[in-house]
């Protein structure tokens, strides 16, 4: 736990109210249950377009469960059920008739541990494109290159596209996973502690990449690292026991929290 607040620019810049900006996604009264365990309890959050929102909180607070709910990944867990609305493009996607394949194309996800396919670097990015019906080899190659460039990986792998993705370093593998996600041209990227398993240099590259990607995508990131949240996010939501304690601009939340629980957590006096 930190013993001091994350460093924030001493000149406090007031961040626009997230509800005043165009929303990429939102949840209304969202509940998630694992059997009898009530993991997420009536969460209302709005995610502004082309901004980075960080979800922070102690281990087991529900932030990763909430993130997985946003593109219905929790549906893959036996005994999990969800209630409430998950709004994307103004449509509630928390309905049985919704095509989850399309949901996950529009709302991409990158997990904590890099999980490249046991295929070539090229095939890792091209696989989803082919699955979605893209057949023209030139178009596929163009999309692969574009995606690898956006993930700041192209210059490192352009001469080795046929090599196994498993030959890459951990940081490169994670950027490959980001390239794989952006190749599907999503509008939203969900990042579940994407740098927690990486060394400091690779972490720095991922953070730089996040700052670049928000020009094209709305990014929602779970992180246990409050310094990282302060560096990369525009908005931050503090979760505790499955509820949102506080949600505001990142600079405001870290320099002038409105709730005592938030103050205690970011000051290292929690628990």
UniProtKB/Swiss-Prot annotation:
Q: Which reaction does it catalyse?
A: phosphate(out) + ATP + H2O = ADP + 2 phosphate(in) + H(+)
Q: Which family does it belong to?
A: Belongs to the ABC transporter superfamily. Phosphate importer (TC 3.A.1.7) family.
**Gene3D superfamilies with a match to the protein in the record:** P-loop containing nucleotide triphosphate hydrolases
Which residue numbers delimit the ABC transporter domain?
A: 25-266
Q: What topology in the membrane does the UniProt record assign?
A: Peripheral membrane protein
Q: What does this protein do?
A: Part of the ABC transporter complex PstSACB involved in phosphate import. Responsible for energy coupling to the transport system.
Which intervals of the chain form a coiled coil?
A: none
Name of the molecule in the record: Phosphate import ATP-binding protein PstB 2
Q: Which GO terms describe its cellular component?
A: plasma membrane
GO terms (molecular function) for this protein are: ATP binding; ATP hydrolysis activity; ATPase-coupled phosphate ion transmembrane transporter activity
Q: An example of a Gene Ontology BP annotation on this entry?
A: phosphate ion transmembrane transport
Q: If you read the UniProt record, what top EC class would you report for this enzyme, in one word?
A: translocase
Q: Where in the cell is it found?
A: Cell membrane
EC number(s) per entry: 7.3.2.1
Q: What binding partners and quaternary form does the record give?
A: The complex is composed of two ATP-binding proteins (PstB), two transmembrane proteins (PstC and PstA) and a solute-binding protein (PstS).
**What positions does the entry give for ATP binding?**
57-64
Q: Which UniProt keywords apply?
A: ATP-binding, Cell membrane, Membrane, Nucleotide-binding, Phosphate transport, Translocase, Transport
